[in-house]
Curated annotation (Swiss-Prot):
Domain S1 motif residues, every copy: 682-751
InterPro entries xref list: ExoRNase_PH_dom1, ExoRNase_PH_dom2_sf, GPSI/PNP, KH_dom, KH_dom_type_1, KH_dom_type_1_sf, NA-bd_OB-fold, PNPase
Listed cofactors: Mg(2+)
Job of this protein: Involved in mRNA degradation. Catalyzes the phosphorolysis of single-stranded polyribonucleotides processively in the 3'- to 5'-direction.
Keywords: Cytoplasm, Magnesium, Metal-binding, Nucleotidyltransferase, RNA-binding, Transferase
Keyword DNA repair on entry: no
Primary enzyme class: transferase
Family of the protein in this entry: Belongs to the polyribonucleotide nucleotidyltransferase family.
GO-annotated cellular components: cytosol
A biological process from GO: mRNA catabolic process
Lineage: Bacteria, Bacillati, Actinomycetota, Actinomycetes, Mycobacteriales
Protein name: Polyribonucleotide nucleotidyltransferase
Any one GO molecular-function label of the UniProt entry: polyribonucleotide nucleotidyltransferase activity
Subcellular location: Cytoplasm
Length: 755
């Protein structure tokens, strides 16, 4: 394929033993970016070590190391990916008590998942040695995002390590930017944070180079392995103003635009490996079963297993297929005559699952059969309900077949925004989405407590789907926490969480810019009667996810996509097949939105238990007066009214209270200070004595405005020696304004009791 947008240069410093590959990414009018891979200087004892640079300032060290011996008893590949964020990379000291880095940030965990997903399939099947990939962020330009650079660095280090892997993986972030010079939008690679703020949509795409036959020729193409994508916060307003909407076709164009950049990154890594890689070592491989075992299982189970797979209920189907597997296992262990019964049992079970996968795939491709009897475009029965939890600010229950999600919304003051201490420029997050996946959701036991990486990833996907439709802080001055509880799982709880969140947010009274729904799709492909067939499945089950070649989750409004996640095992997907699958997902999304709209389609009244937050503006030069010395004034308003008050640097004041009356009382007191209506001579006030002196008592009339009752006025016409003989600090005193001088000083007199 063409490599016109980019080029690769290699350099070798034989004196110092350093080899480097430099890939140039050409974004046309938006300039060039340089990705540099360097090996030979740092971490030389690791099996593979590459220092990766984005331009000059962003620098990551990627290492890959394997254990000497395979892990016994493992029936999976033990790959671990860790991202170590060092705060010195941004010239900062960690904000923790001990002033050192602690548990990984959410951004680091999401970066680990971005690296793991495309890298794991490149390792040879059957490898059981532990492999650890560690990315250490050494330096980061505040304008750059390091996660996609880390994908390339991890792949390059693995290519040099001598481990049995296929070709390199290239990763690129693409941003769709529309401006006066590019009104239809242009996709650019490795956008800066400034460009991220301007973008309509972003894609993180990872892929590899594959060889394909075209007639008698063999040509190289880029096979996409992973996509993580989402619309930006301003997309709804920008589209209304005429910017291009990130529809299915626009997103597909972005995937194609990423391919040339992925190719050049893969070529740079491959060239580095040619010059500096260790010789590939021999590692013991542990295939899950032998051909003999597979043939024996297939011959014995095919007919009955095909019948069992038509049971619609997940639990009933699983019980029936598991019982049959145990029956087959008992028969074949004796028949095969293995010395190691445990190993034979494991092999028979693996072969049984492989045969089951083959049967399901063949039935899908030839008969459009699905395990639960649906057609390929059918959605499972939907259930929608809101306002389940009495004291929650908003709640919902979304059911799709056996997948059940409880959504709960909580609203609070903006000061409750999540504070972020990471290497990104973001310092806070107003919309927070948390996802919980307890073991009982699949009828199992297991660990509960702190979230696992999968839960953090699913929460981030659901959050990304909703962020574009969350109202601005000016329109809705609340911090919003959305929690998705997966109560039952059989296919895409993350997309169920998107639907439940829309319902719950509406129930809480949040004025979303548009409702959002999500759907999980699958794709099955294989050779049938000499031709390659593709079948896209709508609303996949857990089993269909495991048996398919590609799964992708699409969330969006009726007009455009807000989030997309894709993983595939195929060596490339024809563009027309992807277009058809995305169109199928769009139809399903609209069907779900129709069902949700029957229950709720506009914001409800806010819950009685939700705080009432009102925003007012005070002059910046009055902020100090509102706060008062050491916070005295603002604290007194809070104590008197029960309201919480938060003041921004621009003079915006947010007042939160349990009732509207308390909020109004606080606002009245703040306005009296910041936007005062000066009291007039003759007005009467019930004030509070705030200070006594030898010459009189100071009485607070309004917050920040006091007057003086001279000692001569306190005795009711009689002479008194001490002010404290009549009034003390804290006493309530009804007074009348006698005079206001040209400096604003107020003279008061007690109001005589007319009794």
């Amino acid at each position: 394929m063409s490599t016109k947008p980019s080029n690769v240069v290699f350099n070798i410093d034989e004196e110092f033993g350093i080899t480097e590959a430099i890939a140039t990414i050409d974004n046309g009018d938006f300039g060039k970016r340089t990705i540099r891979f360097e090996t030979g200087q740092l971490a030389r004892q690791a099996d593979g070590s590459v220092t990766t640079y984005l331009d000059d300032d962003t620098m990551l060290l990627a290492t890959t190391t394997a254990s000497n011996q395979p892990r016994e008893g493992f029936d999976f590949f033990p790959l671990t990916v860790d991202v170590e964020e060092r705060m010195y990379a941004a010239g900062r000291i960690p904000g923790s008590f001990f002033r050192r880095e602690g548990r990984p940030s959410t951004e680091a965990i999401l970066a680990c998942r971005l690296i793991d997903r495309p890298l794991r399939p490149t390792f040879v099947k059957g490898l059981r040695n532990e492999v650890q990939v560690v990315i250490t962020v050494l330096s980061v330009n505040p304008q750059d995002m390091y996660d996609v650079v880390a994908i390339n660095g991890a792949s390059a280090a693995t290519q040099l390590s001598g481990l049995p892997v296929s070709g390199p993986v290239g990763g690129v972030r693409m941003a769709l930017i529309a401006d006066d010079a590019h009104p239809k939008g242009q996709w650019i690679a490795f956008p800066t944070h400034e460009q991220h703020e301007q973008a309509l949509f972003e894609l993180v795409v990872a892929g590899r180079i594959v060889s394909k036959k075209q007639g008698k020729k063999t040509v190289d193409d880029v096979a996409i392995m992973m996509v993580e994508a989402g619309a930006t916060e301003q997309v709804v307003d920008r589209v209304k103003a005429g910017a291009p909407a990130p529809t299915e076709s626009v997103v597909a164009e972005g995937l194609e635009a990423a391919k040339p950049f992925i190719e050049v990154l893969c070529r740079a890594q491959a060239g580095l490996a040619e010059r500096a890689a260790k010789e590939t070592q021999e590692f013991p491989l542990f295939p899950p079963y032998t051909d003999v075992v597979y043939d024996a299982v297939e011959k014995k189970v095919s007919k009955k297993l095909r019948s069992l797979l038509t049971i619609k209920s997940k639990q009933d189907r699983d019980e029936a297929t598991n019982a049959y597997m145990e029956e087959i296992e008992a028969d074949l262990i004796a028949q095969l005559g293995s010395d190691d019964e445990a190993a034979a049992s494991k092999a028979i079970r693996a072969a049984y699952n492989a045969v089951m996968k083959k049967i399901v795939r063949h039935m899908i491709l030839t008969e459009h059969f699905r395990i639960d009897g649906r057609g390929v475009t059918d959605i499972r029965d939907l259930g929608v309900e809101v306002d389940l939890i009495p004291r929650a600010h908003g709640s919902s229950l979304f059911e799709r077949g056996e997948t059940q999600i409880l959504g709960v919304t909580t609203l609070d003051m903006l000061k409750m925004e999540q504070q972020i201490d990471s290497l990104t420029p973001a310092t806070s997050k107003r919309y927070i989405h948390h996802y919980n996946f307890p073991p009982y959701s699949t009828g199992e036991t297991g660990r509960v407590g702190s979230p696992k990486r999968r839960e953090i990833g699913h929460g981030a996907l659901a959050e990304r789907a909703l962020v574009p439709v969350i109202p601005s802080r000016e329109e809705f001055p609340y911090a919003i926490r959305q929690v998705s509880e997966a109560l039952g799982s059989n296919g895409s709880t993350s997309m169920g969480s998107v639907c439940a969140s829309t319902l719950s947010l509406y129930n809480a009274g949040v004025p979303l810019k548009a409702p959002v729904a999500g759907i999980a799709m699958g794709l099955v492909s294989d050779e049938v009667d000499g031709e390659t067939r593709y079948v896209a499945l709508t609303d996949i089950l857990g089993a269909e996810d495991a048996f398919g070649d590609m799964d992708f989750k699409v969330a969006g409004t009726r007009q455009f996509i807000t989030a997309l996640q894709l993983d595939t095992k195929l060596d490339g997907i024809p563009s027309e097949v992807l277009a058809q699958a995305l169109s199928q997902a769009n139809d399903a999304r609209n069907t779900i939105l129709d069902t949700m709209a029957e229950v709720i389609e506009t914001p409800d009244e806010m819950s009685d238990y939700a705080p009432r937050i009102t925003a007012i503006t005070v002059p910046v030069n009055k902020i100090g007066e509102v706060i008062g010395p050491k916070g005295k004034t603002i604290n007194s308003i809070t104590e008197e009214t029960g309201a919480n008050i938060s003041i921004e640097e621009d003079g915006t004041v947010y007042v939160s209270a349990a009732s509207g009356a308390a909020a109004e009382a606080a606002i009245e007191k703040i306005n009296a200070i910041a936007n005062p209506q000066l009291p007039k001579v003759g007005e009467r006030f019930l004030g509070t004595v705030v200070k006594t002196t030898a010459f009189g008592a100071f009485v607070s009339l309004l917050p920040g405005r006091d007057g003086l009752v001279h000692i001569s006025k306190l005795g009711g016409g009689k002479r008194i020696e001490k002010v404290e003989d009549v009034v003390n600090v804290g006493d309530k005193l009804e007074v009348e304004i006698l005079d206001i001088d040209n400096r604003g000083k107020i003279s008061l007199a007690p109001v005589k009791n007319e009794d």
